[in-house]
């Protein structure tokens, strides 16, 4: 299994997982604030600030 290992949306750093290695999956992209806060997608946590700036 090959995993991407950087927090950016477009990532080219990979790590080959060894047999039995625990897999951790977290996605974190800054996509907007307040009025532009995106709708949550399945299996995604979206945290937004309450006001701009």
Swiss-Prot record:
Localization, UniProt: Secreted
Disulfide bonds: 6-11, 17-33, 37-48
Superkingdom in the source lineage: Eukaryota
Cellular component terms per the entry's GO annotation: extracellular region
Gene Ontology MF: a single term: toxin activity
A Pfam match: Toxin_cobra-type
Predominant location category: secreted
InterPro entries: Snake_3FTx, Snake_toxin-like_sf, Snake_toxin_con_site, Toxin_cobra-type
Tissues showing expression: Expressed by the venom gland.
PROSITE patterns the record matches: SNAKE_TOXIN
Keywords noted in UniProt: Acetylcholine receptor inhibiting toxin, Disulfide bond, Ion channel impairing toxin, Neurotoxin, Postsynaptic neurotoxin, Secreted, Toxin
Function: Binds with low affinity and weakly inhibits muscle nicotinic acetylcholine receptor (nAChR).
Family of this protein: Belongs to the three-finger toxin family. Ancestral subfamily. Orphan group II sub-subfamily.
Protein name stated in the entry: Weak toxin NWT
